Amino acid sequence: MNWRIIAVLVSFLPVILLFIFSPVSVTDIFSVGIAPFIMAVLFSLAKVFLQAYRFKYFVDKFLGYKVSSSLQLISVRVGSEFVTNTTPSYIGGEIVRIAWLTKHKVPAGIAAWITTMEIIADVFVGTILALFAGIIALYNGAILIGTIIILISSFIFGFWLIVVILSAHYNIQLPKVITKLVRRFLSGERSDKIINYTNTAISDLCTMSRENFNSRRTIKIFFFGMVLTFFAFACLGASFLVLGSTIESDLGLYDSILATAASTELGSLPITVGGSGLTEIGLWAYVSGLNNVPSLNEVLKDSHLDVIISWRIASYHIPLMIMWIVLMRLTLIKKNYVEN
């Protein structure tokens, strides 16, 4: 459990450094008002719940039978989000969900298929919104931030599009570079077991792709998942809207959705834990219409900074605590089950 505690503490580091080295204080952060802050938290939790419901929906529809209760499936999705939000590039939660599904006798390939559909839904909706945000930023003269957003979004979208196309036509296996790294750091028997298990799961995933991508039923399921994903992003945008509107009366939901989608894309760079620091900078750069590299003093004195930090606490740190509690509950239930 130590890594989880460390991850939470590290995620707070950018906020702590901001309090130390800038004029921003705790009072400034909560000057947005208690009611808007609570509303921002609720919208952020709604986003998490919609993603959890999407997982439950995909599991029920793709399997065609109940693998567990709705509450348990939603709890697993929420708990796994803690792992997602405490690793670089928002990865790791998928492994938790695959492991949970396989322990409940779901074939590894089908479990990987379900989580891959979740990833694709998030990527497609998130990158499309971010691309719109980048184009609008360019149109408004914010060349630097617009270009950065478009480049990152295009790379992520292109990568996953290639994965989808390849998986639907070929059997993908682990690249030789990765297998060599695994064999270098793990013992022969253990590394072979991991590589064989992973390659089998990937092969099953490719088989599922070929069987399902031409199915109208699958397209309908995935389309509904995309709709849920869009509403999840809309909730994230609304969480910023209720705070941002306290200083900008002309801020609309459309602008807020694009701004938060753009900041999420920047936060997906594998640099910091859960995008901490990058997400805040990305949101600030977008709403400020960044067109050149700013000085540190310009960033620290910007009027948007208080609201952005308030939003980050409401949309990330508080939900993170709830995710941690849910994950601990799942871990304790599993431990008690094993002991009994």
Language-model region placement:
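Mid-bilayer segments of alpha-helical transmembrane spans in multi-pass integral membrane proteins
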Residues: 81-91, 119-131
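Predominantly cytoplasmic-facing regulatory/coupling regions of multi-pass membrane proteins
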Residues: 1-78, 136, 144-267, 293-340
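Transmembrane helix-loop junctions at the membrane interface of multipass transporters and ion channels
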Residues: 128-141
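Transmembrane-helix boundary and interhelical linker motifs in polytopic inner-membrane proteins
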Residues: 59-67, 98-109, 113
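Short intracellular "coupling" helices and adjacent cytoplasmic loop segments at the cytosolic face
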Residues: 66, 78-95, 190, 273
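Membrane-interface alpha-helices at helix entry/exit sites of multi-pass transporters
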Residues: 70-72, 89, 93, 104-120, ...
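Transmembrane alpha-helix interface/packing and boundary motifs in multi-pass membrane proteins
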Residues: 80-88, 261-280
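Re-entrant/interfacial helical elements at transmembrane boundaries that shape
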Residues: 92-102, 273-289
